[in-house]
């Protein structure tokens, strides 16, 4: 399978999230601020802005998907996290909430409803409880000071 990583002029793929059972691939593009769903041939089948906040401009920093198919995207610029659900080839908006300065990486904690966000310029990793989306906004449950935080991983 070849993927056209230059789906739009001036864009670059930053995060390839998951290949779904139907052969679709979720991609987040940093430079043009969009999310795309690609088919098995690498062709774009849908495109949506990664953040619903119009200004400042969004540069998605990272993304992760949960077992139920929820896609979380960190939006640098507006400093938010957006949550999306896919139905067929398109993504549908669930919610968006503020987070720390310059969210660079996200990690869904397997087997839980927790999400970690590494916020680089703030120098912190934030932990959010994400249930039930979209009826209730996620709540921050912890924050860890970590200068230059740029990655969040769960290690066994």
Question: What residue spans do the PLM features occupy?
Answer:
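Long, well-ordered mid-to-C-terminal structural blocks that present hydrophobic/aromatic surfaces
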Residues: 30-72
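Intrinsically disordered, low-complexity segments enriched in Gly and acidic/Ser/Thr residues
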Residues: 76-111
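Beta-propeller fold detector
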Residues: 1-6, 45-50, 92-98, 136-146
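Blade-level signature of beta-propeller repeat domains, shared across WD40, Kelch, NHL, RCC1
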Residues: 120-132, 137-156
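Structural signal for beta-propeller blades
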Residues: 33-36, 79-81, 123-125
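Short loop/turn segments immediately following beta-strands, especially the blade-tip
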Residues: 38-45, 84-90, 128-135
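Beta-rich, blade/repeat-based domains predominating
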Residues: 5-25, 52-68, 97-114, 144-156
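Conserved beta-strand positions in repeat-built beta-propeller and related beta-rich domains
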Residues: 21-22, 27-31, 71-77, 117-120
